[in-house]
Amino acid sequence: FVSGCRNHCPGCFNPETWDFDYGEPFTDETEEELIKALRPSWIQGLSILGGDPMEPENQSALLPLLRRVREELPGKDVWLYTGYRLESVSSSPLLDLADVVVDGPFIETEKDISLAFRGSRNQRIIDLRGEGQWKTQ
């Protein structure tokens, strides 16, 4: 989880992460722990949520981590969860390092616990490595 989110979605499952100062600082030691935890073959990849990884303050810390994941662990997938629509963050360099984005704000009136990988029906699962097609499930 990253800390810091300006969306403040009503009904958010993790509102404590809205605060940019919540939690522990991301250090070189934290990065080493993450890389080590991702190495086993039974670990498919890394999911980054929060807070919101697309907040500018979070992107600067995540870029080096995701570059390292791509270089050292090329078979692992990377999922980013953001309350922003993909169209509004499409220039983010994080997208070049991600495989899948789950986008859109959580909308409590569209909450559906039967959905895979997302909390409300308005959110999309977008396969960035597929043939340019967005998939929603």
Language-model features and meaning:
Residues 19-33, 55-95, 100:
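Canonical radical SAM enzyme core domain
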